[in-house]
Amino acid sequence: EIMQGAYFLTFNFAGLYGEDMWLAGDGREPVADTYRLRCINIIVDHPYHYHAFIQEQLEKRADRYMQICIDQLHMAYMHRYFTQVKLGPFLPTAGTEMLCKPWGERTTDILFTGTYVCPSHFDVFINRNGEEYSQFYHSIIDEVLSDPHALLEDVARRRLTEEIPEATEDELRETLGHIQFLDYYIRFTLRGNVVAALADAGLKVHIIGAGWENLPCSHPENLILSPYASSEECLLALADAKLALNVLPCFHAGAHDRVFNTMLAGAVCVTDSNPYLDQILIDEENVI
């Protein structure tokens, strides 16, 4: 039995945007609204991916909605652009401890878990408004790719205000809610470059995730592909790996759970870093 005013804990707005399995009552409204549930939503990616969903929470259930972020700069973004949203505490990602095989019994040398989309897939969005816009978007992409400390939202905002000095805060927020394709372009460029470099150096890379057959590299024969696996299967694969790769997808003050899942599985996590990881990981103790 669902009690009025109980809590509804979810991730990435699941159950809050009208999926059939979460509808209730004669009016077929979300169960969170039928029972006036207090919603706690943990978003596990950057808030600029969710502007429309965040705005919907403010319109429908502002007094019953709390959002939790897994990166401290994601929280700063919310404070700047969605001041009306009640935020919970910063919630770092964690890992899951599965079977931890002895090193000598592990059969996978290098593992990566994650999907790949060729960056050219996003050219349709970059080029849709002509050459001038394309150059503008690529200037943002190039700056973020050249500086590992650059925040996409900050670079985009600065470039926008350089081009349109009279842009209002509302207009800037609206525009930042449409930069997902830039995020994906950068994310998959970095991810693809890392995997391609290893494959082209002659190393076998086991990959769990869709799309890697489209990776441009000179030695695709070094990619051992498994297109899909459940979360549990990914954890078991980590427990069978000696080394697992991680490329932080636009996290600068938080971390992807791949880092901690790998460590708890007893494998070596090879990852880029950020100030948050530099703070919580101790050199020569759990990181080198």
Where would I find each of the regions flagged by the language model?
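Extended catalytic core of nucleotide-activated donor transferases of GT-like folds
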Residues: E1-T83, T96-C100, S226-P227, S231-E233, ...
